Amino acid sequence: MHDRISSLGEKKLISRIISRARSVFGSSEVMGLGDDAALIDAGEEFLVLTSDLLLETRHFPDPERPRDMGWKTVTVNMSDLAAMGSRPEGFILSVALPDLELEFFDSLMDGVIEACCHYQAPLIGGDTNEADEIILSGTAIGRAEKDMVLMKSGARPGDLVAVTGPLGVGAAGTELILSGRDTGGFENAVERSLRPVARIEEGLILAESGLVSSATDITDGLVSELGELMDASGTGMRIYEDRLPLGREVPEIASILGRDPLELALYYGEDFELVFTAPPTGMEELSDMMELHVIGEVTVGGGIEMVDKDGVTYKLHVRGYEHLSPG
Amino acid sequence: MHDRISSLGEKKLISRIISRARSVFGSSEVMGLGDDAALIDAGEEFLVLTSDLLLETRHFPDPERPRDMGWKTVTVNMSDLAAMGSRPEGFILSVALPDLELEFFDSLMDGVIEACCHYQAPLIGGDTNEADEIILSGTAIGRAEKDMVLMKSGARPGDLVAVTGPLGVGAAGTELILSGRDTGGFENAVERSLRPVARIEEGLILAESGLVSSATDITDGLVSELGELMDASGTGMRIYEDRLPLGREVPEIASILGRDPLELALYYGEDFELVFTAPPTGMEELSDMMELHVIGEVTVGGGIEMVDKDGVTYKLHVRGYEHLSPG
């Protein structure tokens, strides 16, 4: 009788907010709504704005590493800017904190400032509050030329689908840390989990090339993000299992943990690579400019298909890493 | 040995972050740092950006009224824009939520969208997460002409100090609600507590007049905000008890609660009026354009003095509503 928000799941919850907002505001006012970041008209450019909130108990594999927590808070926001092909311009940090040791607090801030330096996005404002756990809310501000900005919509049947780097590494690292097992020999996966790097340069290359038809970042899992591009573009997608660039260490870590490596690559967030579409000739040009891995193609419709190593085609269910997931 | 952040208090904690950021970034890059909102260069204008985070258990006198919670989340952010004399342009909402009833969630969003409409700031983006309590993080975006923007710095000795409306009403309403007593007859104070209104129009009048030397909003209590203007301007302040425009109902509510009405007006947040300084001739002009109450004057230095009803001068301690307060 009294439905709860978990009965909808995160994506439908967001759609619910978006449709309410669209019913009230003009479509030119809410251009970026539903995309990775919001767009504000600033003359010849767009100001690109995004806000993401991270909680000590839910978003950090190791909450004993405050510097990494600060770094990651900036990175998840910068990754949304990267997904729009936008150049970072500044960062705002709102925190709510328990009564931390000053040394811990300073390390947290060092991580934030270190990341702000890395992304050339000065810390320009903020707010502090008290809370029972560490809550870190970031707002990233960037700029993009109006006709260059990357959106989720625009993929066309026949376009190729590509990712900017290996898949499943952040997921494998995160699961390894959470398992409490020895992480020796897997420093790269651990680093990718604790100190992910947003693909700002790659986003700028993609945007400035003018060759890309749609793009997003893989923070919620590849299949979920393909679903986003598909829904925004009104197309389908077909990907090939043997073209997925699984990270080198992913099979071994998955085996240690008794997990399916493909599941880590397809349905887990934390990769922070970009996934994008471009016509075949454009993709060819782009491959001379940057690392990219073509994993499939855009289809007319009918959801996401995967062709496995034996050539058998099956449908992928779009779930990804859904917070507030049903059931 | 291991100091905690509570040993510093909120203001010193913020100063600590600011001085770290200033040591790394150029001063032109971090113009608004320490002010009510951040400033981003956008040609002839500034983009004005602010982010505030509210928690179910700490910032809402009645967490059973989701629509009011949504409204207030937008308002506290808009109030920072008002303090800069900026026109709202958009709002971004990041939420982390427990598994709410859908009806409660919809009311929360109705409150957000209602407030966005009121302030003419479309909801342009957002993010959702799971959490154990309701966490609402807003980012407000506004615009201001470069030479018009209101800052905390700029007050000069001899300027007058004024506020845009009655003091202590939101505080009295909040304390009355929290006491669990009958609120009958005090609808105005209750409304001011649950559905405060940011002084956007007043901020725009002040900014466009070009007459104002410094300004901020009174979310953390009058004395605390006077301290902010003073510190940023390198001056002192003198205020007169008999000029403070205590809200009509404040003495009666204070008496019911056994509280000092003056304390509610001086040291409690929730008023959402603006406090500002201007030279005497400018203040005269402004008083023809809007409601304002002159409460004192800017002095050369020496902290905040209050002259009481008997003409006795004493020092006010700058504490206001400090989160993370020492001791």
From Swiss-Prot, chains A, B:
- The entry's Mg(2+) 2-binding residues are D52, D80
- Which InterPro entries does the record cross-reference, listed alphabetically? PurM-like_C_dom, PurM-like_C_sf, PurM-like_N, PurM-like_N_sf, ThiL-like
Q: Which residues bind Mg(2+) 4?
A: D36, T50, D80
Q: Which residues bind Mg(2+) 5?
A: D220
Q: What's the name of the protein?
A: Thiamine-monophosphate kinase
What is the organism of origin for this protein?
A: Methanothermobacter thermautotrophicus (strain ATCC 29096 / DSM 1053 / JCM 10044 / NBRC 100330 / Delta H)
Tell me the keywords, alphabetical order: ATP-binding, Kinase, Magnesium, Metal-binding, Nucleotide-binding, Thiamine biosynthesis, Transferase
> Keyword ATP-binding: yes or no?
yes
Annotated Mg(2+) 1 binding sites: S51, D52, D127
Query: What family is this?
Result: Belongs to the thiamine-monophosphate kinase family.
The record's disulfide annotation reads none
